[in-house]
Amino acid sequence: MSKPLCSTGLRWLWLVVVVLIIDLGSKYLILQNFALGDTVGLFPSLNLHYARNYGAAFSFLADSGGWQRWFFAGIAIGICVILVAMMYRSKATQKLNNIAYALIIGGALGNLFDRLWHGFVVDMIDFYVGDWHFATFNLADSAICIGAALIVLEGFLPKPAAKEQA
């Protein structure tokens, strides 16, 4: 017997769409208005800087000859499938976990789209202090990191007391 989808964590999939729209929209604006390597200062310690990432986080495996594109695409698809299954098994009222899963799925799909469409991931957020620059990243990366942090946070929060049955 199946349960109504609105009573499951799948109720939170709308957040995946929001993350995708914001992420892909920001990348579209960068691609339309920046040449590769262009930089525009936004605030002290924060630039928009168009970079291409052919690898994973911190350009891991970026110079590996192209196979990593499909490897990371497969990982993204696998993680998305697992997280959607976890959302289906969870209750809609488990907000923190479902929001975390949706953020990770949205970010993974945003970067997956880039990998499959362009062959690289569009990065544009350049955070720096003095001459030290953090790795350039994008909004999908931010969504994934926030989602992962929420999962860790949830692990430290007290669990609700189980209802006693009379």
From Swiss-Prot:
Membrane-spanning ranges: 12-32, 70-90, 102-122, 137-157
GO cellular component, one term: plasma membrane
EC number: 3.4.23.36
Reaction equations catalysed: Release of signal peptides from bacterial membrane prolipoproteins. Hydrolyzes -Xaa-Yaa-Zaa-|-(S,diacylglyceryl)Cys-, in which Xaa is hydrophobic (preferably Leu), and Yaa (Ala or Ser) and Zaa (Gly or Ala) have small, neutral side chains
Keywords: Aspartyl protease, Cell inner membrane, Cell membrane, Hydrolase, Membrane, Protease, Transmembrane, Transmembrane helix
Keyword Membrane: yes
Membrane topology term: Multi-pass membrane protein
Protein's pathway: Protein modification; lipoprotein biosynthesis (signal peptide cleavage)
Xref: Pfam families: Peptidase_A8
Family: Belongs to the peptidase A8 family.
Functional description taken from the UniProt entry: This protein specifically catalyzes the removal of signal peptides from prolipoproteins.
Protein name from the UniProt record: Lipoprotein signal peptidase
The encoding gene: lspA
